[in-house]
Amino acid sequence: IDISIRADLIEEVGRIYGVDNIEGKLPVVPMKMGHLDKTTRKIRAKMSNMGLNETLSYILINDKDVHKFTTDEFEEVRLLDPITEERNTLRYSMIPSLYKIYEYNKARENKDVCLFEIGKGFWKKGEEYGENQKICVLMTGKYYEGIGHNKNVDFYDIKGVTEELLDYLG
């Protein structure tokens, strides 16, 4: 028996006991949730508690839609080899994506839509690329405020949702 380091001992145990007799187990690694994940989870819970439904939309949009809803100065982040020209650019804002959801629902006569999305926006300035975590809210039609209390959405409903979320986050 040649045992000079720890690996030699482990090898001998495997040889004598039999490698096939040793049960394979994955190590238990404790994971801590990061600050951003905790905050995102809190925001999701709060928005859901306020009666909004979460949606997830494509991060790839058409390059014609990128500058449609913003006056910010940035270059779009285009894909070098897109699968389709309809989705050839990484979104800067979630507004074009949520607007497509609004159009889809409107075409199916679903006028009561109260959604939010938490996702990433991508940008380029010169040679620098970046991404930001963003939140976007879409409210149209009737807003459910409790049993028997539905009312048409107006500016003050959206303002109220925004203020309540900001108060909640401190």
Regions found by a protein language model. Name each.
Residues I1-V113:
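Extended, well-folded interaction surfaces typified by the phenylalanyl-tRNA synthetase beta subunit core
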Residues A7, I118, N132:
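Beta-strand scaffold of nucleotide-dependent catalytic cores
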Residues I16-P27, E75-L80, G121-H149:
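Residues forming anionic-ligand binding surfaces in small-molecule and nucleic-acid pockets
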Residues M94, Q133, N150-D154:
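Short intrinsically disordered coil segments
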Residues I95-Y99, C136, E163:
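Generic detector of well-ordered alpha-helical segments enriched in charged/polar residues
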Residues P96, E117-K120, G126, K159-V161:
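Regulatory modules associated with amino-acid/nitrogen control
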Residues N105-E109, C114, W123-G126, E131:
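Mobile "lid/hinge" segments at catalytic clefts and subdomain interfaces of large enzymes
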Residues M139-G170:
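N-terminal non-catalytic structural scaffold regions of very large proteins
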